[in-house]
Every structure is written in C-alpha cells, then in structure tokens.
C-alpha cells in the first residue's frame, strides 16, 4: 500500500479534485460554457498549473465523462451481482443513479458529470464515450427486455423507455 504522502497519491488526489470541481461546473454551466479559467479559479489554482493535469478543456470534459461512465458501469455490475430479477435490476439501477447524483450534490465522494455534451469532443474521444454509453444503455435496456419476457414488466418499446428513464435521471441532476 502506497503512502498518502507519495507524489503519486498527491497527484491522484489533486486530479480527482480537479475532475470533481470541473464536473460540478459542467453540470451547472454546461461543458461548452465552462472555461479552464473557471475551473482553476474555483480550485484556487492558476490556469497554468491546471495544464499539469489536463491538456485542453476537451481533455477535461473527456476525463469527467469517462469517470461518470465508469461509475455507471460499476453500479450496474453491483446491481447484477445482487439480483437476477429484471424488475429489481431496473429499480436498483435507477436508485443507484439517483444515489450517485445525491452523493455528488451533498459533497460525498467525487462529483458526477452527467454525460450530456459528448458531441463537443474530438472524434476519437466522442466515439469511445458513445460506445461506453451505448454499452451501459444496452445493459439497462436488457433489464427491461428480460422483464417483459418474464412477464414482470408490461410490454413497451424498450429503447424509448430506457432512453426516457436514463435521460430523465441525468437531466434531473
């Protein structure tokens, strides 16, 4: 176990603080409207020192959204380990999504950046995040489909329903 005073640990802690503050700004001001100077000012840093951790604003957006999708996939992993019941998976996945948002708002843990502006990113970053979001989306939609097959969820258009639920969760934040 490494020391919390090691350079690597300090770098990771500072990086996490930057991503968390940037995520909060992206959610309130929008990723397009937030500048690196905004992030630096909120952290009491110079813009120059921020460049030690991120290359560009797009890189910062990418890192925040990537962290968000990792957290969403982890929450689905937990849900899948807890239950095989598809309706319960839908409900628990939504509950976990809400918990992530509420924890962010209450200052517990890292702030969650709702991945709402992926389109502003360069092609390679955008494509990777879109693939990860689609993978998460398909997992969630699969819970709905399995529930319909088992008769515990009424017949619906699963793509539209999954999209509506996930979008509502991100926009309610």
Positions of PLM-derived features:
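N-terminal intrinsically disordered/low-complexity leader segments
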Residues: 1-13, 20
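Hydrophobic/aromatic residues within well-ordered alpha-helical segments
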Residues: 14, 57, 68, 72, ...
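Helix-turn-helix
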Residues: 17, 21, 25-59, 63
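Hydrophobic alpha-helical connector segments
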Residues: 63, 77-106, 161-165
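Amphipathic alpha-helical packing segments from all-alpha helical-bundle domains
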Residues: 70-73, 113, 123-150, 159-163
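Amphipathic alpha-helical segments used for helix-helix packing
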Residues: 89, 102-124, 141
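Hydrophobic alpha-helical segments that form the core
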Residues: 95-96, 141, 155-173
């Amino acid at each position: 176990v490494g020391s919390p005073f090691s350079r690597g640990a300090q770098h990771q802690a500072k990086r996490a603080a930057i991503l968390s503050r940037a995520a909060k700004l992206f959610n309130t001001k929008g990723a397009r409207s937030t500048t690196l100077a905004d992030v630096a000012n909120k952290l009491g840093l110079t813009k120059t020192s921020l460049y030690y951790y991120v290359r560009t604003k797009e890189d910062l957006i990418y890192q925040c959204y990537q962290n968000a999708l990792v957290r969403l996939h982890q929450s689905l992993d937990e849900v899948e380990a807890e239950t095989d019941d598809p309706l319960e998976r839908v409900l628990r996945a939504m509950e976990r999504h809400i918990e992530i948002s509420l924890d962010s708002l209450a200052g517990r843990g890292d702030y969650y950046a709702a991945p709402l502006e992926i389109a502003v990113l360069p092609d390679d970053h955008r494509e990777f995040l879109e693939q990860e979001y689609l993978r998460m989306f398909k997992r969630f939609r699969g819970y709905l489909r399995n529930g319909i097959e088992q008769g515990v969820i009424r017949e619906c258009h699963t793509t539209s329903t999954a999209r509506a639920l996930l979008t509502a969760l991100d926009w309610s934040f």
